[in-house]
Amino acid sequence: MASSNLIQQLQERGLIAQVTDEKALAERLAAGPIALYCGFDPTADSLHLGHLVPLLCLKRFQLAGHRPVALVGGATGLIGDPSFKATERKLNTAETVQEWVEKIKRQVSPFLDFDCGDNSAVAANNYDWFGSMNVLTFLLDIGKHFSVNQMINKEAVKQRLNRDDSGISFTEFSYNLLQGYDFACLNKQYGVALQIGGSDQWGNITSGIDLTRRLHQNTVYGLTVPLITKADGTKFGKTEGGAVWLDPSKTSPYKFYQFWINTADSDVYLFLKFFTFLDLAAIDALEQEDRASDKAPRAQYVLAEEVTRMVHGEQGLAAAKRITASLFSGALADLTEDDFAQLAQDGMPTVHLERVADLQQALVAAELVPSRGQARTLISSNAVSVNGEKQASIDYVFDDADRLYSRYTLLRRGKKHYCLLNWQ
């Protein structure tokens, strides 16, 4: 992705929501490598899918020869960004935020190259400059450059001020100053000339541009990526179980993979542009192939493979595909003990049973049927599988061969209703 047409390529992928002085930024990028940054506040112990587009945008710039700075908000994470939030965030302790900072730094690292010469990535933490700053320095060196009139007219703040049920605290109101100063600090330390972020960050970004000009007399730029919405209007990156996280202990590679497999046809080609590095010609060709085929679209599988590999590596992708194939075919021999643990983690209904139990008892305990009578009916109708094998004996009692890894048995009612038995 050459610098000379990087902005154009981002536009073609739909990755630019707003940009300050697009022509001047394009000329600056064409003139040579720049440093740019994106901030990630530790508001949880993991990044989620909403962070992925700006994070991948940093990577796109690095691939074009520019130097990315990943800023983790050890200070701003203590305050909480009020932008377009209906109520004030719950404040977390310094110890909790510091723990989350370290986790997020580890999550960001695999996406960027920290050892590639002049455009090696940098990891920064804004607690380094805010942690020892006293209130007088803050007011004199930063506060005097901000107009309260302008701050309260920013859309993100205005929405909170206009709500009858909640206002905005001075703590959150100050967030805009902190993020603005981040830009000025990074401009001085690393020559950062561009900040990228989600479109909800536009007000904070423009504040940083103005403060950098006032403090250092430097011209810098801002670019926002769109907040992702689905074609049906529902929120992207959420499932019935909540957010889709990048941490495999919070959202397993299998569940992550399934999230992308279930992408609607109306969204999948756009998401390939947002979340993968496939060139546009390949994405267009895939779309034409899918439209001409009478088979299920291939795009969802391409998307799921590309993004799962990027986030969880080849091993995570292999596990996700193995579990998917085994559940679909009913052949469980290829599943590892860790795969079964993933299924339990992902929320597959799991019940703990004593070693002596029959199939009827297990079906009732698993809440696949309400009674033994209905269990007998279901078994007789050949609608129950034990580890992928149909079981038609109403008197069936489990034996050691049914306990995979001496611990797990997978029950299925019909085609879609599963329960994992965990033997004591």
Swiss-Prot record:
Binding site for ATP: K238
GO biological process, one term: tyrosyl-tRNA aminoacylation
Disulphide connectivity of cysteines: none
Binding positions for L-tyrosine per the UniProt entry: Y37, Y175, Q179
Annotated S4 RNA-binding domain residues: 357-414
Reactions that this protein is recorded to catalyse: tRNA(Tyr) + L-tyrosine + ATP = L-tyrosyl-tRNA(Tyr) + AMP + diphosphate + H(+)
Alphabetical UniProt keywords: Aminoacyl-tRNA synthetase, ATP-binding, Cytoplasm, Ligase, Nucleotide-binding, Protein biosynthesis, RNA-binding
Enzyme class: ligase
Main location: cytoplasm
Motif segment ('KMSKS' region): 235-239
InterPro entries associated with the record: aa-tRNA-synth_I_CS, aa-tRNA-synth_Ic, Rossmann-like_a/b/a_fold, S4_RNA-bd_sf, SYY-like_C, Tyr-tRNA-ligase, Tyr-tRNA-ligase_bac-type, Tyr-tRNA-ligase_bac_1
Gene Ontology CC entries for this record: cytosol
Molecular function (Gene Ontology), one example: RNA binding
CDD domains: S4, TyrRS_core
Similarity-based family: Belongs to the class-I aminoacyl-tRNA synthetase family. TyrS type 1 subfamily.
Assembly notes: Homodimer.
HAMAP family per record: Tyr_tRNA_synth_type1
Function in brief: Catalyzes the attachment of tyrosine to tRNA(Tyr) in a two-step reaction: tyrosine is first activated by ATP to form Tyr-AMP and then transferred to the acceptor end of tRNA(Tyr).
The protein's name: Tyrosine--tRNA ligase
Organism (species): Sodalis glossinidius (strain morsitans)
